[in-house]
Amino acid sequence: MSGLGRLFGKGKKEKGPTPEEAIQKLKETEKILIKKQEFLEQKIQQELQTAKKYGTKNKRAALQALRRKKRFEQQLAQTDGTLSTLEFQREAIENATTNAEVLRTMELAAQSMKKAYQDMDIDKVDELMTDITEQQEVAQQISDAISRPMGFGDDVDEDELLEELEELEQEELAQELLNVGDKEEEPSVKLPSVPSTHLPAGPAPKVDEDEEALKQLAEWVS
């Protein structure tokens, strides 16, 4: 390749990393920055202790410790910002990867559904449902024909059967009434036989005294 081509970037472009590779690289960088945060926090605490140690005894050494502490705090703030940016970028790639996978799945599902219905239309469905309904009706008619009794009972007069049934009911009712009458009839009372010997005569009844007096008076008058 000529130097001019390399200068204007017309050469073959390298293939970029996959989302998975980018996410993995970001995670590794995040781990490095987290370790740097821990290191800077330790240095800040050390310089703070140094400044407290010298205090007013060695003002110059105390000020130098505070200056170093300030620089470490600035580096820590930069590291915090960088780490936040990397985390945001990694989450964005993860979300994009998830969304892309969801879209691919939806596309495959749509293609599969389209393939499943490519030989179908509403007219064919209606025709199929009509055929199914007709076949169900035929099946029902066949079932009815099979279950219908054959060879007897078709020429029997229904009115004649009802009349015969009514006669049987009347006979049964009359028999029930007869049975009730027999149960209600009282059994005859058997009287004792007349004795063959004469009973002794009882004492003669006493004549009323008034009648006797009237009889005597009538005889006296006559």
From Swiss-Prot:
GO terms for biological process: autophagosome maturation; autophagy; late endosome to lysosome transport; late endosome to vacuole transport via multivesicular body sorting pathway; macroautophagy; membrane fission; membrane invagination; midbody abscission. Residues 20-105, 155-180 form a coiled coil. It is a peripheral membrane protein. Residues 151-222 are annotated as: Intramolecular interaction with N-terminus. It holds the Pfam family Snf7. Residues 1-150 are annotated as: Intramolecular interaction with C-terminus. Changing W220A: Abolishes interaction with PDCD6IP. Residues 1-21, 180-211 are annotated as: Disordered. It comes from the Eukaryota. Widely expressed. Expressed at higher level in heart, kidney, liver and skeletal muscle. Also expressed in brain, placenta, lung and pancreas. Changing L214A: Abolishes interaction with PDCD6IP. The modification Phosphoserine is found at S196. It is found in: Cytoplasmic vesicle membrane; Late endosome membrane. Residues 1-116 are annotated as: Interaction with phosphoinosides. Keywords: Coiled coil, Cytoplasmic vesicle, Endosome, Lipid-binding, Membrane, Phosphoprotein, Protein transport, Transport. GO terms for cellular component: amphisome membrane; autophagosome membrane; cytoplasm; cytoplasmic side of plasma membrane; cytosol; ESCRT III complex; kinetochore; kinetochore microtubule. GO terms for molecular function: ATPase binding; identical protein binding; lipid binding; protein homodimerization activity. Belongs to the SNF7 family. The acidic C-terminus and the basic N-termminus are thought to render the protein in a closed, soluble and inactive conformation through an autoinhibitory intramolecular interaction. The open and active conformation, which enables membrane binding and oligomerization, is achieved by interaction with other cellular binding partners, probably including other ESCRT components. Probable core component of the endosomal sorting required for transport complex III (ESCRT-III) which is involved in multivesicular bodies (MVBs) formation and sorting of endosomal cargo proteins into MVBs. MVBs contain intraluminal vesicles (ILVs) that are generated by invagination and scission from the limiting membrane of the endosome and mostly are delivered to lysosomes enabling degradation of membrane proteins, such as stimulated growth factor receptors, lysosomal enzymes and lipids. The MVB pathway appears to require the sequential function of ESCRT-O, -I,-II and -III complexes. Probable core component of the endosomal sorting required for transport complex III (ESCRT-III). ESCRT-III components are thought to multimerize to form a flat lattice on the perimeter membrane of the endosome. Several assembly forms of ESCRT-III may exist that interact and act sequentially. Self-associates; overexpression leads to the assembly of filaments that curve and associate to create circular rings. Interacts with CHMP2A. Interacts with CHMP3; the interaction requires the release of CHMP4A autoinhibition. Interacts with CHMP4B. Interacts with CHMP4C. Interacts with CHMP6. This is Charged multivesicular body protein 4a. The gene is CHMP4A.
